[in-house]
Regions:
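A conserved ligand/cofactor-binding region detector
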Residues: 1-187
Length: 187
């Protein structure tokens, strides 16, 4: 294994978060802050927060590899994880800092949180159980991974039309999913 190189960790100050969000908007999404819409600001915020999560995730993976730790692998057809931004902010302890950074740019964090789509990865008890199981692994500090099916159109929305159930696709990936890393070499 190659030795990790030295780099500057993304900082968590309000000013650093403000710059990071604006940078992601301009250079990852390719949008001018003057004309960006709410969803583009949401994605920029998600990418900036993801950077801070990834550092911890990579450090955790590196520790597990160096110790040859056993891991739990959980396979489920569903993962009902819900919207992720507010949970990530609370887990990182940066909710108020991100809120302050966005307010300094004239944005409301709660409005952006409401803009985030629910991942179309489940809609029942099995999905909730899987999410709780993974949350328990993280809370207990146990190494583990969850595997499932990534549905392009979700688990379908169910509506009642003229007294009958009607299913329709859930376009949860309409704007992409900033939490994901595309792995073109993996199927």
């Amino acid at each position: 294994m190659n030795a990790p190189f030295t780099y500057a960790s993304p900082t968590l100050s309000v000013e650093a978060l403000k710059h990071s969000i604006a940078y992601k908007l301009m250079f990852t999404i390719g949008k001018d802050p003057v004309i960006a819409n709410k969803h583009e600001w949401l994605n920029a915020t998600l990418f900036a927060v993801r950077d801070r999560l990834v550092e911890r995730w990579l450090r955790s993976n590196r520790a597990q590899l160096s110790q040859e730790t056993r891991q739990v692998y959980y396979l489920s057809m569903e993962f009902l994880i819900g919207r992720t931004l507010s949970n990530a902010l609370l887990s990182l302890g940066i909710y108020d800092d991100v809120k302050g950074a966005l307010e300094a740019m004239g944005l409301d964090l709660e409005e952006l949180i409401d803009e985030e789509n629910d991942p179309g990865l489940g809609n029942g008890g099995l999905g909730r159980l899987a999410a709780c199981f993974l949350d328990s692994l993280a809370t207990l500090g146990l190494p583990g991974r969850g595997y499932g099916i990534r549905y392009d159109y979700g688990m379908f929305k169910q509506n009642i039309v003229d007294g009958r159930q009607k299913e329709s696709p859930d376009y949860w990936l309409e704007y992409g999913n900033p939490w994901e890393f595309k792995r073109h070499n993996t199927r």
